From Swiss-Prot:
Organism this protein belongs to: Escherichia coli
Role of this protein: Tip adhesin component of type P pili that binds preferentially to Gal-alpha(1-4)-Gal-containing glycolipids such as globoside. This tip is common in E.coli strains that cause human cystitis, but rare in pyelonephritic isolates.
Gene that produces this protein: papGIII
InterPro entries, per the entry: Adhesion_dom_fimbrial_sf, Adhesion_dom_sf, PapG_carb-bd_N, PapG_carbohydrate-bd_sf, PapG_chaper-bd_C
Amino-acid biosynthesis in keyword set: no
Subcellular location, record wording: Secreted; Fimbrium
UniProt protein name: Fimbrial adhesin PapGIII
Amino acid sequence: MKKWLPAFLFLSLSGCNDALAANQSTMFYSFNDNIYRPQLSVKVTDIVQFIVDINSASSTATLSYVACNGFTWTHGLYWSEYFAWLVVPKHVSYNGYNIYLELQSRGSFSLDAEDNDNYYLTKGFAWDEANTSGQTCFNIGEKRSLAWSFGGVTLNARLPVDLPKGDYTFPVKFLRGIQRNNYDYIGGRYKIPSSLMKTFPFNGTLNFSIKNTGGCRPSAQSLEINHGDLSINSANNHYAAQTLSVSCDVPTNIRFFLLSNTNPAYSHGQQFSVGLGHGWDSIISINGVDTGETTMRWYRAGTQNLTTGSRLYGESSKIQPGVLSGSATLLMILP
């Protein structure tokens, strides 16, 4: 009997451990902030720096997300951990204009994740906090007054090159909140993933106000390059062009960059091209440069011309008659 006793004890203890259940509930309290910053006088060539300043923000938070997982009440001890979250966007659109935001300083936060749309910043500030029995998960909509001692972050804003002179207020929507996890065991760790947090309502607004004193403007928002009616035998290498003017109030460099909207039928090496259908491509040039990009310099305020050209290309084994159509997008990029 003695030689079986250790095995019997081991199996009994193992069975008891398997029967234990680990419980966790997660809650997220979000703040409804509405922050105003003093208006800044800028030019579109400036990289504008501003702070998502929480000092003047709300202290009342609303429970906006819960994952109780059946763990809503306990009669024994439970343990809590807390994270502060600040999620800020990478771009803001308003009245047809886009500004692009870059994280310049994260302050006391760590950058937990980022995607094409947002920076997800967090700071853990309490772990394994023991609590007596009670409710461990609450109902959506519950309000609490929560302290915030984590500060904010600093962002750089890049303005659209064609933003007209005038006064603008861009609403920067962001998410600020406190995540609380409750466990019926010590040592639990869990952060809400960014893919889930991205779906939360961004109830914070920072009103980014600027007075634009100088920028650059094209004379047209679109160009149509028409090759006219051509014989299939004479269309190859046919060239057509259109010119627009670009006016700048301030000295600057502008990089003009083409993006194809219709895929070409052929490979053209370093030359930029778009597909026109029926076995035809258009090789596009900007001021005579056909690589898809060029830079123009304004040493003083003034107007310069930009000529966009199209040269038809097709191989005899593939070309067909028909209506040819293609398009590209021309970006104006400041340094």
